[in-house]
Amino acid sequence: MTALKVGSESWWQSKHGPEWQRLNDEMFEVTFWWRDPQGSEEYSTIKRVWVYITGVTDHHQNSQPRSMQRIAGTDVWQWTTQLNANWRGSYCFIPTERDDIFSAPSPDRLELREGWRKLLPQAIADPLNPQSWKGGRGHAVSALEMPQAPLQPGWDCPQAPETPAKEIIWKSERLKNSRRVWIFTTGDATAEERPLAVLLDGEFWAQSMPVWPALTSLTHRRQLPPAVYVLIDAIDTTHRAHELPCNADFWLAVQQELLPQVKAIAPFSDRADRTVVAGQSFGGLSALYAGLHWPERFGCVLSQSGSYWWPHRGGHQEGMLLEQLNTGEVSAEGLRIVLEAGVREPMIMQANQALYAQLHPLKESIFWRQVDGGHDALCWRGGLMQGLIDLWQPLFHDRS
């Protein structure tokens, strides 16, 4: 068989995203490709193609950023790394004409964060990879799942929902703003007995990575009970940063304004042990805050990559919720909690481990999971479904 010439049209047609080769039982060598639309270095103004892999080359790692290398005389850029056989994560490319970002030999964490902040608006998904979506920061990303990545319940065999989600507008008097909210129901249980799940960052789970097929699949397979799901839009990053971190007004508005509006459309149970609040990052922090402060309404908490360092970003001080738990101002007694964090997000993992240690005396009702991943929705989507399964498992015993 004749080898294809690197950079030829037929060579590019043979590429369908990252390629990998097994090194041993635990590791793969993975190569990423990008085609320069301007052609070779003779014609192109592209100086760098940064590779942003969540949990591998992002600012959480405090490591030197990685740039692809051009194969001389071609339109081919490539970069090779090694990944665990069970790794899963998202990535994007950032082609740029600038060569002055990350110029320091070993940038510190804040320099890295600032550099990526400048670059990420230019990020693109991998054109060779059909699995792409708009990430939480607003830029396109693509999926990479290694051969032994853990099963993600519901996402492995999605099913089309019988009825679409209903989108409403919630006009809040308390918060003085308006936002979209999605209401989704599954199954055919008695309406007043249906458990309720409140999902934060609802626009992501409704539009960028819709959860409806996974929820429908798990309900049909009797891994989840028939339920009502309420997905709350964060509006934008400014509102999100104000409303989600430990904000009483937000949760009072949810309880006093939004939930009655939802209940008129899709009735659900008022029981705290049937009610889940789920969120990621600031949303994870917010979910636990809601459970700790209104346990009579929110009895189940699903927190993924929760920002428990807040409000001290440096990670050198205990976060506010940890302080409140330590002083006894709040108690997790009676709550069922899923706590999940990625080993590739060090500061968040450290804060979550400290929280888990604080909650450990209640270990019978705490589900603690470490994930081989970063601050990444591709990891969160599996944990979100598994968390709902774990938190609602007692409901199946109630019905038997």
UniProtKB/Swiss-Prot annotation:
Q: Which reactions is this enzyme annotated as catalysing?
A: Fe(III)-enterobactin + 3 H2O + H(+) = Fe(III)-[N-(2,3-dihydroxybenzoyl)-L-serine] + 2 N-(2,3-dihydroxybenzoyl)-L-serine; Fe(III)-enterobactin + H2O = Fe(III)-[N-(2,3-dihydroxybenzoyl)-L-serine]3 + H(+); Fe(III)-[N-(2,3-dihydroxybenzoyl)-L-serine]3 + H2O + H(+) = Fe(III)-[N-(2,3-dihydroxybenzoyl)-L-serine]2 + N-(2,3-dihydroxybenzoyl)-L-serine; Fe(III)-[N-(2,3-dihydroxybenzoyl)-L-serine]2 + H2O + H(+) = Fe(III)-[N-(2,3-dihydroxybenzoyl)-L-serine] + N-(2,3-dihydroxybenzoyl)-L-serine
- Keywords recorded for this protein, A-Z: Cytoplasm, Hydrolase
| Location(s), subcellular | Cytoplasm
EC numbers listed for it are: 3.1.1.108
The answer to keyword Cytoplasm applying to this record is: yes
One of this protein's GO BP terms?
iron ion transport
Keyword check for Chaperone, yes or no. Answer: no
Name the predominant localization: cytoplasm
Give one Pfam family, short name only. Answer: Esterase
NCBIfam families linked to this entry: PRK10439.1 (NF007758)
The record's family statement is: Belongs to the Fes family.
Q: What protein is this chain from? A: Iron(III) enterobactin esterase
Species name: Escherichia coli O6:H1 (strain CFT073 / ATCC 700928 / UPEC)
